[in-house]
A protein has these predicted regions:
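Short, surface-exposed, polar/charged, turn-prone segments marking secondary-structure boundaries
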Residues: 23-26, 44-48, 66-71, 151-155, ...
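Phosphate-binding site of ATP-dependent enzymes
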Residues: 16-17, 101-123, 130-135, 140-224
Length: 276
């Protein structure tokens, strides 16, 4: 039931409306102008408006400040990225700029690998700056690979969920997936409410490699053992001897990402109040 300023049911008037849709195709009009109710998350957090590059710029700043506090290189918790706009994969428009940006990022990653003695071959992941759902994703190890994209790849990159056309992409430093669950490559996904880590799961895919996108058909999921982690520091032993508690580390990065998201949404809020 929609009134002038509220949305509810026949016998229920909520103070808060919880949204569980990413709104890639846009927000329905029935949710607009609800100034007396909270929308969680707000409308400008939908993926028709939100951009990955904006989030990662905010996360980069948070990681730098956190790294300075601890005296660590922020790169250890913040993979490098860049953004390219003005693309049209169907017509090969902007591919030269994408190739140049990809080559530049791979060069930066190689320098970091040399600094830390990492012998793996670097790669980047190119994905739409808008949208979600693991669509329109491409792994590149050499910028020359972008010279001759086949029609299938162009079509995959040109349009994503809900028919959205891709004109802007984010190029992210690829990070090899080291985790395994039942011999399948696995990556952690952490759930948060407010500033609290409340759980998570491993997304795993037996048919994908350590440098591939796991968010694809055939993926399966198992809960993360946050509460009953067996990898806790042992009492009385020297620091660094106990096996690392990976689950705690996941939670730290998740909380940093949540802080970055709060900065992001505050900066992009169309109804933000301005104080003189």
């Amino acid at each position: 039931v929609r009134t002038k300023v509220r949305l509810g049911l026949k016998n229920f008037d909520a103070c808060t409306i919880l949204l569980n849709n990413d709104r890639s195709a846009g927000s329905p009009g029935i949710l607009e102008d609800l100034h007396e109710q909270y929308l969680l998350p707000p409308l400008h957090a939908g993926w028709s408006v939100r951009r990955k590059s904006t989030h990662f710029k905010n996360y980069e700043e948070v990681a730098k400040r956190f790294g300075k506090m601890l005296g660590i290189d922020p790169w250890l918790i913040n993979p490098m990225f860049s953004q390219v706009g003005g693309l049209n994969f169907a017509e090969d428009t902007g591919v030269d700029a994408l190739q140049a940006a990809t080559d530049a990022l791979l060069t930066k990653v190689r320098r970091k690998y040399k600094e830390y003695g990492i012998n793996e071959k670097p790669f980047v992941v190119i994905k739409p700056d808008n949208g979600t759902y693991g669509m329109g994703i491409m792994t590149v190890r050499d910028a020359k690979e972008l010279d001759a994209l086949n029609r299938k790849t162009k079509n995959k990159m040109a349009v994503i969920k809900d028919g959205q056309t891709v004109s802007d992409v984010i190029i992210q430093e690829g990070v090899l997936t080291q985790e395994r669950v039942n011999d399948a490559v696995a990556e952690p996904v952490v759930y948060m409410m407010d500033r609290y880590v409340v759980g998570g799961f491993y997304r795993m895919h037996a048919e994908r490699g350590v440098d591939e996108n796991l968010n694809s058909p055939g993926a399966s999921f198992v809960p993360l053992a946050f509460e009953h982690s067996t990898h806790m520091p042992q009492p009385g032993v020297r620091p660094g001897v106990s096996a690392p508690n990976r689950f705690y580390m996941y939670g730290v990065v998740a909380r940093l990402a949540m802080l970055a998201a709060s900065y992001e949404l505050e900066a992009t809020d169309p109804d933000a109040e301005v104080y003189d």
